[in-house]
From Swiss-Prot:
Domain of life: Bacteria
KW Endoplasmic reticulum (keyword) present: no
Keyword ATP-binding: no
Organism of derivation: Paraburkholderia phymatum (strain DSM 17167 / CIP 108236 / LMG 21445 / STM815) (Burkholderia phymatum)
UniProt enzyme class: hydrolase
SUPFAM superfamilies noted in UniProt: Metallo-dependent phosphatases
NCBIfam families named among the record's database cross-references: apaH, PRK00166.1
The protein's Enzyme Commission number: 3.6.1.41
GO molecular function: bis(5'-nucleosyl)-tetraphosphatase (symmetrical) activity
InterPro entries noted in UniProt: ApaH (IPR004617), Calcineurin-like_PHP_ApaH (IPR004843), Metallo-depent_PP-like (IPR029052)
This protein's encoding gene: apaH
A Pfam family matched in the record: Metallophos
CDD domains assigned: MPP_ApaH
Catalytic activity: P(1),P(4)-bis(5'-adenosyl) tetraphosphate + H2O = 2 ADP + 2 H(+)
Stated name of the protein: Bis(5'-nucleosyl)-tetraphosphatase, symmetrical
Length: 282
């Protein structure tokens, strides 16, 4: 089946353990059986059905195309003793499951970025200085490090806000940390690609001199379609070459999915309400 005749992917925002709402949304969107299902990361945590949610996605096999989000990496870090569970986390049932090792192995082998048919899927964003090729190269470096025998040491070194800007000469763990920060945590940066982490609010909460990563003039991925999640306060954002899918399901808002047709005019949005998955802690 060629790309031109295959069913368009259906891309979902952050699920965060909201399994019931995911099932409702999948039934409502009713994609063809051969349609790939893309997930913008944060499959688990904060919602009450994280274990069942994770098992459902794994059971989809190759049809599921998830990228890693910060909550997925947090689960790996807690499992490795690098981080401790936080108030509001709902990952203990995963860690206590008899098949925990298999599930954690599966998560550790998911990509940080996926590119197909002119569409790039990431969890949080792409630095404005990165084109598609560099984004995929950097994501691949981090993916291989997380799949290697020394993955725990790598994972422990990914936390922190420095370096906060891209430089081609970055090497080692600094390079991997910068890649992870951009792909899984970024919201705002300035025109030079310096990231800011002081705000997780909507566009209006940008610190002086900063803007959403996707609004930086001359962004090198502006000619392709970038699909992302992570930014619940932003809400659903649909532009011709930009699709922000985190509409705050775990905040009791909505869970969103978009049919990723090649033509922006043919893309369709499906949503369900998420009042039943409101978490106590955000």
């Amino acid at each position: 089946m060629t790309a031109s005749t295959a069913s368009a992917p259906l891309a979902f925002g952050d699920l965060q353990g909201c399994r019931t709402q995911f099932q409702q949304l999948l039934a409502k969107a009713a994609p063809p059986a051969d349609a790939p299902l893309w997930f913008a990361g944060d499959l688990i945590n904060r919602g009450g059905e994280s274990l069942a949610m994770l098992r459902d996605i794994i059971a989809l096999g190759d049809r599921a195309v998830p990228v890693l989000g910060n909550h997925d990496l947090h689960l790996l870090s807690v499992s490795a003793g690098i981080r401790k569970s936080k108030k509001g986390d709902t990952i203990d049932e995963i860690l206590a499951a008899p098949d925990a090792d298999d599930m954690l192995h599966w998560i550790r082998h998911r990509p940080l970025a996926h590119y197909e048919n002119g569409m790039l899927l990431v969890h949080a964003g792409v630095l404005p200085q990165w084109d598609v090729d560099l984004t995929l190269e950097l994501a691949d470096e981090l993916q291989r490090a997380l799949r290697a025998p020394g993955w725990k040491e790598t994972l422990a070194g990914l936390y922190g806000n420095e370096p906060n800007r891209w430089k081609p000469g970055l090497k080692g763990i600094d390079r991997l940390r910068l890649t992870c920060t951009a792909l899984t945590r970024m919201r705002f940066c300035n025109a030079d690609g310096v990231m800011d982490f002081s705000s997780s609010g909507g566009i209006g909460s940008a610190p002086a001199g900063f803007m959403p990563w996707f609004d930086v003039p001359g962004r090198k991925t502006e000619e392709i379609t970038v699909v992302f999640g992570h930014w619940a306060a932003l809400g659903l954002l649909i532009r011709d070459n930009l699709i922000g899918l985190d509409s705050g399901c775990v905040w009791g808002e909505q869970l969103s999915a978009v049919r990723l047709a090649q033509s922006a005019a043919e893309r369709t949005v499906t949503q369900v309400e998420c009042e039943g998955c409101r978490a106590d802690v955000h």
